[in-house]
């Protein structure tokens, strides 16, 4: 899918403009935590969403996709549990993580489960392979690197397990682990609810750490070399430039710039690989998932923006859904709206993780126990 368009940001008040490498960027904003409510609890409906939020996230863009349909065929009556992780591999197959048929996140869904949480499908949804039972407490996101290796972040903690990142080959053999099993902390060899991995073209490994909501929780990016040797870290809990509040998702563009979905701050922050700040984008909504394809088409899933009172998930004027644009200049061209009402509840709905296949069809991994495929019209 080719996107040719200019940056489309609406800015108000005293929001500043940065012009960075020919890119117009909007500055500002905030995020929610996963609810323990059941999937049947939809967000409460409020008023109709406006054309755009104060931070520039548009709700009135064209939607070139058919309505999402449930996707993925399991044997033996198994059904999707909560999920936030899905990725396309170099061969076009789709990899996903499943929290072992259970509902919720950051819990102990897979601890003691006989189910495999790492799953490979073809694009029709046929299950090709699964593995990983007994390894995870609560898998969060999955990444496929350019060599086809798989990276899974486990942000659960139970009985001496969890709080690690695993690297697998496609047969499920463990090639590397990062972090200490069952240990959560701020050290250079520990994580506190790691969320996702991104692998640079040279093999350097970047881990978003972490998902914690406490004031002293980790909120940083950790960098390792291709062998797992720690190199550096940057970021802390906060709202300033280079600070994070739930760095929830990572992606690289073709220039090797690192995109960090700083979810609780309702923004994407962009850095070079040494942690130097490049830009801040708020026009894509509240980023639960970010995927960038080889043509620098960027797909951003917003599963939590809400109206109502300030607090977790508060992002007034921004409707949930998938925004699609250009990673080169930050322009947003398309919007696939979440079918849930424009609500005041912080419950997650719609895609929390996403990827796209080679023709541009989208696969959205949902906290509410499903994966949906969105086919281009």
Residue ranges and their predicted role:
Residues 29-32:
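Bacterial lipoprotein signal-peptidase II cleavage site
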Residues 6, 26-27:
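Short terminal (N- or C-terminal) low-complexity/amphipathic segments
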Residues 13, 34-377:
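Eukaryotic scaffold repeat domains enriched in small/polar residues
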Residues 2-15:
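Bacterial N-terminal signal peptides that target proteins for export
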Residues 12-26:
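Bacterial N-terminal signal peptides
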């Amino acid at each position: 899918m080719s996107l040719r368009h200019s940056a489309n940001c609406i800015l108000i008040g005293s929001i500043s403009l940065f012009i960075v490498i020919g890119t117009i960027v909007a500055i500002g904003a905030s995020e929610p935590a996963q609810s323990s409510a059941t999937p049947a609890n939809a967000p409460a409906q409020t008023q109709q969403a406006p054309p755009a939020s104060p931070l520039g996230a548009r709700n009135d863009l064209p939607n070139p996709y058919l309505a999402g349909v449930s996707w993925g065929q399991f044997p033996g009556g198994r059904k999707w549990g909560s999920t936030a992780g899905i990725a396309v591999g170099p061969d076009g197959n789709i990899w996903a993580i499943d929290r072992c048929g259970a509902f919720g996140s950051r819990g102990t869904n897979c601890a003691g489960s006989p189910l495999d949480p790492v799953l490979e499908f073809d694009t029709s949804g046929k299950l090709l392979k699964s593995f990983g039972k007994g390894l995870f407490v609560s898998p969060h996101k999955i990444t496929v690197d350019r060599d086809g290796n798989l990276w899974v972040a486990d942000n659960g903690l139970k009985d001496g397990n969890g709080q690690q990142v695993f690297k697998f080959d496609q047969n499920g053999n463990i090639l590397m682990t990062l972090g200490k099993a069952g240990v959560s902390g701020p050290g250079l060899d520990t994580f506190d609810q790691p969320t996702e991995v991104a692998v640079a073209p040279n093999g350097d490994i970047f881990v978003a750490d972490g998902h914690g909501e406490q004031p002293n929780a980790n909120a940083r990016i950790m960098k390792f070399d291709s062998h797992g040797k720690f190199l550096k870290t940057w970021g802390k809990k906060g709202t300033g430039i280079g600070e994070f509040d739930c760095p929830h998702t990572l992606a690289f563009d073709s220039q090797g710039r690192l995109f960090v979905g700083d979810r609780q701050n309702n923004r994407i922050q962009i850095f070079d690989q040494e942690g130097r700040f490049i830009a801040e984008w708020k026009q894509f909504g509240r980023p639960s998932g970010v995927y960038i394809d080889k043509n620098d088409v960027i797909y951003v899933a917003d599963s939590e923006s809400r109206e109502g009172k300030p607090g977790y998930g508060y992002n007034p004027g921004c409707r949930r859904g998938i925004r699609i644009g250009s990673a080169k200049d930050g322009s947003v061209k398309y919007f696939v709206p979440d079918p849930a009402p424009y609500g005041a509840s912080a419950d997650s709905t719609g895609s929390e993780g996403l990827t796209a296949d080679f023709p541009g069809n989208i696969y959205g991994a949902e906290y509410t126990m499903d994966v949906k495929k969105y086919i281009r019209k």
